[in-house]
Amino acid sequence: MSSPQLTYYDMGAGVLAFSTMRQGGNSMGNYADFNINNYCGDAPEHIARNRQALAALIGVSEQHIVMPHQTHGTVVCRVDAPPAEVLEGVDAVMTDVKGLCIGVSTADCIPILLYDAEHHAACAVHAGWRGTVQRIVQEAVKQMQTAYCSQPCQLKAVIGPGISLESFEVGDEVYQQFADAGFDMDPIARRYAKWHLDLPQCNRIQLEAVGVRDVWMSDICTYQQYEQYFSARRLGINSGRIYTAIVLK
């Protein structure tokens, strides 16, 4: 078995930040090769071996790999120790504890990592279109301010692999939800045969609106690069998930 392949992000010397790719694991079919998500139908024995491989690669114990069960809401959970049970209904996790690997699962939705170097705190955010329209990334920044005294102007943000404007076709009702929520649609929407939305850009705009200036965009479209990164629109819901995570050193 080859080692898991990761896309790394340079967020500073104090952290390890990455997204998993599809290569280098034990899973099969639409989960091939590397999936560690328990909630998408993959074989438990494959997930277990993949988690072991990831833990060994990044230098943490398996118990320190934190992955919530996401429900497209806006709940941000502070994690101070390895959870004793599933983090149910959580779409963002934050910590200031060294050695905890906090992350979110995506397969077209937008993963966002936040890092506060001054207070050595981090957050991982899952922003699908429902979370984006509810401004979950702004809620995450707010929660980091409350928990760790993080200043938005000092945060670093990475917007990881997700579906691009060119590939994210939506119905009129989804477009209207964004318009009704007060978004300026010109920078984030384009009309082809149907409306297309730019979720990465929408989350970047939200971050900048609350004072986060250091935002790095991966510009990886999961739909177009589905051979390297999982895409539910390409592969179906019963397929693997990307794990985008950050570990405080």
Predicted regions and their residues:
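Active-site microenvironment for binding and transforming phosphate-containing groups
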Residues: 1-249
